[in-house]
Amino acid sequence: MSDPFANPDQTLDTQGLRCPEPVMMVRKTVRHMQDGETLLIIADDPATTRDIPGFCRFMEHTLVAQAVDALPYQYLLKKGL
């Protein structure tokens, strides 16, 4: 089974940042991406377990994968649906 986090188009490390900074950085990064590109988000803020999936739903992006069982958390977002 392949690692869904292995080859993202971009990576954003938000470790050490607290809500709302991680989501603000994700939004800024995604704005400059092309539809279909992927972004690996690395975070350690517990609020991201709620905020990143919510951002994807609200902004109509795809949350391809998430790993939130241990720190750092990882989220793979694909721009667009």
Curated annotation (Swiss-Prot):
Pfam families: TusA (PF01206)
Top-level taxon of the source organism: Bacteria
Active site (record annotation): C19
Pathway: tRNA modification
Gene3D superfamilies: TusA-like domain
Record's GO cellular component terms: cytoplasm
PROSITE patterns: UPF0033 (PS01148)
Main subcellular location: cytoplasm
Subcellular compartments: Cytoplasm
InterPro entries: Sulphur_carrier_TusA, TusA-like, TusA-like_sf
Keywords per UniProt: Cytoplasm, tRNA processing
GO-annotated molecular function: sulfur carrier activity
GO biological process, one term: tRNA wobble position uridine thiolation
Job description of the protein: Sulfur carrier protein involved in sulfur trafficking in the cell. Part of a sulfur-relay system required for 2-thiolation during synthesis of 2-thiouridine of the modified wobble base 5-methylaminomethyl-2-thiouridine (mnm(5)s(2)U) in tRNA. Interacts with IscS and stimulates its cysteine desulfurase activity. Accepts an activated sulfur from IscS, which is then transferred to TusD, and thus determines the direction of sulfur flow from IscS to 2-thiouridine formation. Also appears to be involved in sulfur transfer for the biosynthesis of molybdopterin.
Homology family: Belongs to the sulfur carrier protein TusA family.
Quaternary structure and partners: Interacts with IscS.
Protein's name according to its UniProt entry: Sulfur carrier protein TusA
Organism the protein comes from: Erwinia tasmaniensis (strain DSM 17950 / CFBP 7177 / CIP 109463 / NCPPB 4357 / Et1/99)
Gene giving rise to this polypeptide: tusA
